[in-house]
């Protein structure tokens, strides 16, 4: 029964499911930067809050990657998109009233939610279906991308607020620096 249900969700029979093409080529909106002849940025143009500039994995400081994994998904390298131990921890926290048990979403699930957002106001059944969809999309993302590519997409897409979308914009807006110059405590 459970596998059949996941098959229906995965096949898009129970609501939206991104196509293989959409998973392989997610829409990314990066800011357009205008440079002077001497290399200084004259201006930026971006849509909505998508004030971001792409950053390669090799250019992301290890301290930023370590901070992300330590705070969001300590078993990131040990799962395939769904952290079953984390889900049991959250369920136990809900049953015992322990609100400090933390969340159960993995970095990949959070990326799935960022890449394929859905309506915010939903009833319990719609929320449950959205969570199942996130799990399926997370597993598909893990099959399509390396862990490094997932971290790169996440850090280039995450909204740090105040028009700081992506690690490049966040480092600049909050610390007036570039990601490679962030101190460990800033990461």
Model-identified regions with their sequence ranges:
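N-terminal type II signal-anchor transmembrane helix
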Residues: 1-35, 75, 95
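Peptidoglycan glycan-strand catalytic modules in the bacterial/periplasmic cell-wall system
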Residues: 29-31, 35-187
């Amino acid at each position: 029964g459970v596998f059949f249900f996941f098959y229906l969700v995965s096949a898009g029979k129970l609501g939206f499911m991104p196509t293989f093409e959409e998973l392989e080529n997610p829409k990314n909106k990066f800011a357009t930067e205008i440079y002077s002849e001497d290399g200084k940025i004259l201006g930026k143009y971006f849509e909505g809050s998508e004030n971001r500039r792409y950053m390669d994995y090799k250019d992301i400081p290890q301290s930023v990657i370590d901070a992300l994994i330590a705070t969001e998904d300590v078993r990131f390298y040990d799962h395939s998109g769904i952290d079953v131990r984390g889900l049991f921890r959250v369920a136990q926290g809900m049953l015992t009233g322990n609100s400090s048990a933390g969340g159960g979403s993995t970095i990949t699930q959070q990326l799935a939610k960022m890449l394929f957002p859905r309506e915010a106001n939903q009833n319990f059944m719609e929320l449950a279906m959205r969570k199942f969809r996130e799990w399926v999309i997370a597993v598909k993302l893990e099959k399509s991308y390396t862990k490094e590519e997932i971290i790169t997409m996440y850090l280039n897409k995450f909204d740090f607020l105040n028009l700081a979308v992506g690690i490049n914009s966040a480092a600049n807006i909050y610390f007036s620096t570039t990601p490679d110059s962030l101190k460990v405590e800033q990461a």
